[in-house]
């Protein structure tokens, strides 16, 4: 039990670092400063951590814990009321999907990660669902009007489709890489 908790905490820390790498990669693709591509790149980079955690700790709660860490980050970093909700909701739902397959079913684990990847979308969703509140949060954090104008992404159908598609592609690739790496690590230890 103690080993599972430690493994989960380490995975949460490493996944959090993957989110940071995802933000950096997103900024390389889009120089506006918004986080539009960060969830997709975070999923691409974090898929391996997720799949290895499922192999090492095949119990309900591990994935929920990482979702909670993501949620607490968004809550603590003042991204706006509600930005933390996707982390909690996606973490719980993803954990439930993985649990249905006893964390051994490749397809359910893949679906689980596709859902989990949307846990980092809170700030973008808030920008689209409550733009005035999102702008007020940015102003309260000391952001200039120029910055705000640059990072706001209109919630038109093309942008929404691009956002969802990019997250799904990043998550799919991240999960497949993660499953291959997890399998390789399992063969090395046996």
Please name every model-derived segment:
Residues 5-10, 40-41, 63-68, 84-85, ...:
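Hydrophobic alpha-helical transmembrane segments
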Residues 15-21, 69-77, 116-125:
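Aromatic-anchored segments of alpha-helical transmembrane domains
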